[in-house]
Amino acid sequence: ILVISISEKGGHVVFMNYNRNIEAESVTQERADEIGKQFLESHGFKNMKETYYLKQEGIVTINYAYEQEGVVVYPDLVKLKIALDNGEVMGIETTGYLNNHEKRNVSNIKISKEEAKKGLNPKLEILSEGLAIIPTEWKSEVLCWEFKGRVDETDFLVYINAETGKEEDILVIVNTPNGTLTH
């Protein structure tokens, strides 16, 4: 069964889902990510970065966020479903990208990365760091320093506002054999 939803304005694919039986897996997660990036690029979604994925029943769902000048823009999200038996794209969901994509001002950084680190838990072992735009609960966006780190055996994402130095959000990263998600 193939289900497709097309936007009235612009005729963009908002949602597509195709169901079929999945055979034995022969495509790796890494190869599926490459296939996904090529698919997105060929359909006009440029500068997309894999952020999270989940494997279920022979299909991997990969979240891709737009990247502008090295800043990960999480509101501009596209989700792809890729079959792990043959690499076929079986689904796409573009609502986040279609509703939010625009050029952002990513130069309004008033707090240095080092200043932002001062607000972190001293027990946090930093694994990676960079800039990201995240959505807020008030339907706006904020430019933040994103720190991926670990305390004991738990991984976290900590977001520090790049303009005010205020902690905006903390997410727990859940690593499972089937993928990486946050909550």
Protein language model features and the residues they cover:
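Long, terminal "pre-/pro-" and other extracytoplasmic accessory regions
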Residues: I1-H183
